[in-house]
Design a protein with these regions (language model features):
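A structural signal for multi-pass alpha-helical bundles of membrane permease subunits
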Residues: 5-278
């Protein structure tokens, strides 16, 4: 029974990994081979496109073209770095103290406010898009990276993740620190941050995976092409440059994979923590 379960899990894992193999194989194919395989798509003719998991004649030409002949790629890569880094830094500055306040202090309307936080967390961007657009327009932040970063900084999702970890800190430990003369700020710095670091890291990993691939907000709020992130670079590659699209997809995927692998253990702790009923 155990072997059967393992076999099924391996099959599903391979199925989930197939798109990655698909991208990697396509990025190593030459223009002629891609044109041959994707002929019905490129020409709009009848029939079905075919595919091979291994290129006939592997080549790095697509990567050379991307990294040496596509300067706009590096501009958009840097835009993605600035967007993601700015959002995550802002969420740490705003979200960590907010989560600590929810977890360690009692105040009137706390439960109602937390319910509002959860409701906001569940709302998709499409619901908030018009109001965000109008506010950013009044503030003069449309068509700026700040206009993308600022609303995301105040996302309630990282607060929800970190709140669970801060709430789990034993009260006896807090009392012992108070007896040693620690004030509320030092409790936060010396006790809260070290013990809540798994929650902070898991929130940052999830945030990176979301904001690295951000597409709806840039499409709605950015008009200048030089401000676009990588998520808008890929859809604008023509079908005739399929190899370039595959290579760009692999390069864009790598940071997300590396961050996920580095923070996987913390991410699992965050998922388990948020699944525990209060």
């Amino acid at each position: 029974m155990k072997k059967t379960g393992t076999f099924i899990c391996v099959c599903f894992a391979l199925l989930a990994a197939f798109p990655v193999f698909f991208l990697a194989a396509g990025s190593l194919m030459g223009a002629g081979e891609l044109k041959e395989l994707l002929q019905p798509i490129l020409t709009g003719g009848e029939g079905f496109a075919s595919w091979k998991m291994f290129p006939r004649y592997p080549t790095l030409r697509s990567y050379v073209e991307l990294l040496l002949d596509s300067p706009e790629f590096f501009v958009m890569f840097w835009n993605s770095v600035k967007l993601t880094g700015g959002i995550l830094a802002g969420q740490i500055l705003v979200g960590v103290p907010a989560a600590w306040g929810f977890a360690r202090f009692s105040f009137p309307g706390k439960k109602l406010l937390f319910i509002i936080y959860i409701a906001l967390m569940m709302m998709p961007f499409q619901v908030m898009m018009l109001s965000n657009y109008l506010v950013l327009d009044r503030l003069g932040l449309l068509d700026t990276l700040t206009g993308i970063i600022l609303p995301a900084v105040f996302s309630t999702f990282p607060v929800f993740i970190m709140y669970r970890f801060f709430e789990g800190i034993p009260e006896a430990l807090m009392e012992a620190a108070r007896l040693d003369g620690a004030g509320e700020f030092m409790l936060f710095i010396r006790v809260g941050l070290p013990l809540g670091s798994p929650g902070i890291i898991s929130a940052m990993v999830l945030g990176f995976l979301e904001y690295w691939n951000l597409i709806e907000q840039p499409m709605a709020f950015l008009k200048t092409k030089s401000l676009w992130p990588l998520s808008l670079f890929l859809p604008n590659i023509s079908l005739e440059k399929a190899g370039l699209a595959f290579a760009a997809s692999v390069v864009v995927l790598l940071p997300a994979v590396l961050v996920f692998l580095a923070g996987q253990d913390y991410l699992e702790q965050g998922i388990i923590s948020t699944a525990i009923k209060e």
